[in-house]
Amino acid sequence: MDEVLIGEVIKPHGVQGEIKVYPITDNPKRFRKLKEVILVQNQEQRRLKVLHANVHQSEVYLTLEGINTRDKAEAIRGWAVKADRDQVPPLKEGWYYFELEGMQVYEGDVLLGTLAQVIQTGANDVYLVKGDKGEICVPALKTVVKHVDVAGKRMDVELPPGLIDGEELR
């Protein structure tokens, strides 16, 4: 089953094993619906049942089965928090960031590079594309992004004039 990164364990909270999680989402309330999480560090992976999820503004606190002391919570500090993809609610429109990252970005037949990061700017997202000749920031606009093939890991773009200095990436 596909796993999705949803956060990172920041620190223990209290003495009964509750953990504070840094959520990687713009809607932390999604954590309330989780039945299970996967904690990952290096090659170690632990699947744990979510007993309780408390969300206060942008802060997330989880109580997990088997993590019932501060020492046990401290032992998982810094671990990645993942969920099975079927536990991640669908978006109203568009794609998940993790589906876009790693895509090969083309303009026509020319490979510009790999989509390395989705940057939220407020107005519109920007795709950071890293290629052999450097990095470019591609605005996530319908006028620029012409086609996205999630299964094929390919994005086709038509860059606006002047976005690349001297055409060095083409």
Swiss-Prot record:
<dbReference type="GO" id="GO:0005840">
    <property type="term" value="C:ribosome"/>
</dbReference>
<protein>
    <recommendedName>
        <fullName>Ribosome maturation factor RimM</fullName>
    </recommendedName>
</protein>
<keyword id="KW-0690">Ribosome biogenesis</keyword>
<dbReference type="InterPro" id="IPR011961">
    <property type="entry name" value="RimM"/>
</dbReference>
<keyword id="KW-0143">Chaperone</keyword>
<dbReference type="InterPro" id="IPR011033">
    <property type="entry name" value="PRC_barrel-like_sf"/>
</dbReference>
<comment type="similarity">
    <text>Belongs to the RimM family.</text>
</comment>
<comment type="function">
    <text>An accessory protein needed during the final step in the assembly of 30S ribosomal subunit, possibly for assembly of the head region. Essential for efficient processing of 16S rRNA. May be needed both before and after RbfA during the maturation of 16S rRNA. It has affinity for free ribosomal 30S subunits but not for 70S ribosomes.</text>
</comment>
<keyword id="KW-0963">Cytoplasm</keyword>
<dbReference type="InterPro" id="IPR009000">
    <property type="entry name" value="Transl_B-barrel_sf"/>
</dbReference>
<feature type="domain" description="PRC barrel">
    <location>
        <begin position="92"/>
        <end position="163"/>
    </location>
</feature>
<dbReference type="Pfam" id="PF01782">
    <property type="entry name" value="RimM"/>
</dbReference>
<dbReference type="InterPro" id="IPR036976">
    <property type="entry name" value="RimM_N_sf"/>
</dbReference>
<dbReference type="GO" id="GO:0042274">
    <property type="term" value="P:ribosomal small subunit biogenesis"/>
</dbReference>
<comment type="subunit">
    <text>Binds ribosomal protein uS19.</text>
</comment>
<dbReference type="Pfam" id="PF24986">
    <property type="entry name" value="PRC_RimM"/>
</dbReference>
<dbReference type="GO" id="GO:0006364">
    <property type="term" value="P:rRNA processing"/>
</dbReference>
<dbReference type="GO" id="GO:0043022">
    <property type="term" value="F:ribosome binding"/>
</dbReference>
<dbReference type="InterPro" id="IPR056792">
    <property type="entry name" value="PRC_RimM"/>
</dbReference>
<keyword id="KW-0698">rRNA processing</keyword>
<dbReference type="GO" id="GO:0005737">
    <property type="term" value="C:cytoplasm"/>
</dbReference>
<dbReference type="InterPro" id="IPR002676">
    <property type="entry name" value="RimM_N"/>
</dbReference>
